[in-house]
């Protein structure tokens, strides 16, 4: 062999190796692996619910802490509580990813699920701002589920169902981001909303934000119990032998689904030098920033007054839009995305989705000119299409990220992506809120007005489209096409 061929470590089959066992199961299994997909769905939902459940009541929670000297300061403190989770996750995602690559996916999933039970419950029992922000930060530090479950989803099913398994992660996460606010909105302050059921002297009267946290923690407990039967996918008990192999053979083996024939390679080059991986992570971060900024802006825009270009929706109206779009998202991901990805390819789906989102977002300000049934019909259709395109982007990037690295580095690779994404997402909500407020204050300004051609917040959606355009351009980085 040539001198530049790298020294690698080879793993031979072992009857007791959990990774080898799952590989044999994949080879023997026929049909859709519903059991494995169910595990993936449950864990993905568990990681999404705590993130979004506090948004409907965080304003009132901060108000009841009496830390804000005036009402205008409540949003300032609420922003710190919201961002503390992402900061904690950004600090520890790489650490958890490396542990998952060393000790396996299952123990890390169990730790992450258990942390939801503990810290999410404590958050609902918080009686001060500093306790709430500390518990939220710790929840982010131990919430290692999303990155690990993405790596797990790509390994537990055969190559044929890879797109389906990762689309289940995206769909469950999307549903969780819709169910979370519903749980928080309906169950917070139950003694005030449902006095016939909950008295002011009960624990739910003394801790008005405990019930939504308790419901999510009970669900997390059920997931923790179910995960005891979760099969491990990491090759942890194979015999190690030194050998030489051309690095291209590793990529060829992984592209065939990561299964073991006679030997399995473990090679750990620096992930930071993996240019296709770094390119995918950069694109993922840009689209994640745009997505979370849109989520923040959409809620503010929908409930704002029509004089500011909003829809004058109630919280119930917004909830209905989110619920309908969530149902449409579920149908799209399970029935439409897998055959679409197979027919046109991953990169084509990502680029097509990014292109179509730009004219769609450009239409949003003009939807505010509608009213009545027409308004509700159009905004629901637009929301379904927007979520379907966004999830197509995310799912495609998930798959390409896992294809960019061998199995024994997928945990660390997803940890790096989670760290970078969490950093970007920590700026998204605050940036989106500032942008929205700035645009509303400049409705009639002569320079960079909030409205341009119509009494709508066009400037807000213009900025969102600029971020979307940057992400689209970045998909043409040459290294990304190498993953196909």
UniProtKB/Swiss-Prot annotation:
One GO MF term: transmembrane transporter activity
Short name of any one Pfam family annotated for the protein: MFS_1
Gene coding for it: ZIFL2
Intrachain S-S bonds: none
Domain of life, per lineage: Eukaryota
UniProt keyword terms in alphabetical order: Membrane, Transmembrane, Transmembrane helix, Transport
GO biological process assignments: response to nematode
Protein name: Probable peptide/nitrate transporter At3g43790
